[in-house]
Amino acid sequence: MLAVTLLSLALLGSTCACSTSTSYEAGIVCRITKAALLVLNQETAKVIQTAFQRASYPDIKGERSMMLLGRVTYGLHNIQISHLSIASSQVELVEAKSVDVSIQNASVIFKGTLNYGYKGAWGLNIEQSVDFEIESAIDLQINTKLTCDSGHVRTDAPDCSISFHKLLLHLQGEREPGWTKQLFTNIISFTLKMVLKGQVCKEINVISNIMADFVQTRAANIISDRDIEVDISLTRSPIITATYLESHHKGHFIYKNISEVLPLPAFSPTLLGDTRMLYFWFSEQVLDSLAKAAFQDGRLQLNLAETELKVVLETWHFNPNQEIIPEVITGFPSPGQVTVHCPRRPTISCQNKGVVVSSPVVMEFLFPHKDGQDSVTHTFEEDIVATIQASYSKKKLFLSLVDFQIKPKTTSNMAESSESIQNFLQLMITTVGIPEIMSRLEVALTTLMNSKGLDLFDIINPEIITRDGFLLLQMDFGFPEHLLVDFLQSLN
């Protein structure tokens, strides 16, 4: 159950404002469907086993008057789990209510020490201490609600029940029934059932909230990088339907702890389906804010030394007219470097044909001066509008250029400028600059995503789709074993 609900939260995870609004306003929306829950349910046994093992089982003590034996006292001590196996489990989504998980035919073996004694009618005092095993077969029903507490997502399982089909007491490893075994089985069975139910259900709630914090921290880390963070607070409580779980997030970017709060766009549930396991909806406002944060952080700049520039030109098979290049660098013995940067922040919008990036671009040719300082010999600025489509395959991000427009704006050192130089620079940006920037972005973004552990997920047939005003990710996935392993290790 925890593997279902809480690993779902690893995908949905966030802090929340606990709003009771019925509106659908968000910058980011996440939908995880019933098919995904069935995959996550595969490893329910490991988390349930952890709950049983972590539960603290109190000593069970009591006494009872028995015919012939007199007053019998008993105590079960050091109760622990020695084995647990689950035959099957099912998960259901109850609309507007809960995530329900049924576990059938779980085999659980408890072990510990039994102390007992009695004073018989003939003055006999008998005290014994023996090791025991309790062999049980149970069904477990857990109905989990997603709630908010102190600004965080919390899970609550008020409906947690355990049904015992078998409860056998074995003393010192013996399997043949005896009067002692029969006596204490009858005495302690009811008490033991109540204690186990209370402790196991309590531990399930404890672990669920530990895991909620774990996955929310992990989710926040995945979408943060240095001074750039994303506010993924919920704009309303999570939605549960018969076919999916859905959460709605602000998606405001935070740069150096300063957040720009913008009006949230409207989201329509009909924009997402339920045939894939996982959906993410991003408004173009989120992508535009990302471009702004990257610009503020100085990430939109490229510096190439002379040797690097030559390698880049060769990579893209650029063979410019040899008479033009000397004209650009007239008066300087050897070029220092070329710098490409955005003087103002880019803007991003989403259209059916792709993500549209509009940005002013400045190219500066820098050459060493006689006094050892760099000197700008030529500056070329233009406005570029590029339409890009993206795909993700074999754990790598790929960008493809669908369309572009270039509008020259200004050049410096006009005495050295000419129409041929402008044509050369425009040609170089078209055939080298844009492809090189996109290639470097592919590598940088893939490296960033993998540094956050994205490559550890088994992502199946992902699709990146753009529509007017938003970008949509939809995919299937295999069970995120690494998340479960990390979480279970964190409990130790």
UniProtKB/Swiss-Prot annotation:
Record PROSITE patterns: LBP_BPI_CETP (PS00400)
SMART domains given in the database record: BPI1, BPI2
Entry keywords, A to Z: Cholesterol metabolism, Disulfide bond, Glycoprotein, Lipid metabolism, Lipid transport, Secreted, Signal, Steroid metabolism, Sterol metabolism, Transport
Compartment(s) where it occurs, according to its Swiss-Prot or TrEMBL record: Secreted
Pfam families, alphabetized: LBP_BPI_CETP, LBP_BPI_CETP_C
InterPro entries: Bactericidal_perm-incr_a/b_dom, Cholesteryl_ester_transfer, Lipid-bd_serum_glycop_C, Lipid-bd_serum_glycop_CS, Lipid-bd_serum_glycop_N
Family annotation (SUPFAM superfamilies): Bactericidal permeability-increasing protein, BPI
Residues glycosylated per entry: N257
Primary location recorded for the protein, binned into one broad class: secreted
Example of a GO cellular component annotation carried by this entry: extracellular space
Signal sequence extent: 1-17
Residues in coiled coil: none
GO BP field: cholesterol homeostasis; cholesterol metabolic process; cholesterol transport; high-density lipoprotein particle remodeling; low-density lipoprotein particle remodeling; phosphatidylcholine metabolic process; phospholipid homeostasis; reverse cholesterol transport
GO MF annotations, alphabetized: cholesterol binding; cholesterol transfer activity; phosphatidylcholine binding; phospholipid transporter activity; triglyceride binding
Catalytic activity: cholesteryl (9Z-octadecenoate)(in) = cholesteryl (9Z-octadecenoate)(out); 1,2,3-tri-(9Z-octadecenoyl)-glycerol(in) = 1,2,3-tri-(9Z-octadecenoyl)-glycerol(out); cholesteryl (9Z,12Z)-octadecadienoate(in) = cholesteryl (9Z,12Z)-octadecadienoate(out)
Disulfide bonds: C160-C201
Family: Belongs to the BPI/LBP/Plunc superfamily. BPI/LBP family.
Function, in words: Involved in the transfer of neutral lipids, including cholesteryl ester and triglyceride, among lipoprotein particles. Allows the net movement of cholesteryl ester from high density lipoproteins/HDL to triglyceride-rich very low density lipoproteins/VLDL, and the equimolar transport of triglyceride from VLDL to HDL. Regulates the reverse cholesterol transport, by which excess cholesterol is removed from peripheral tissues and returned to the liver for elimination.
Protein name: Cholesteryl ester transfer protein
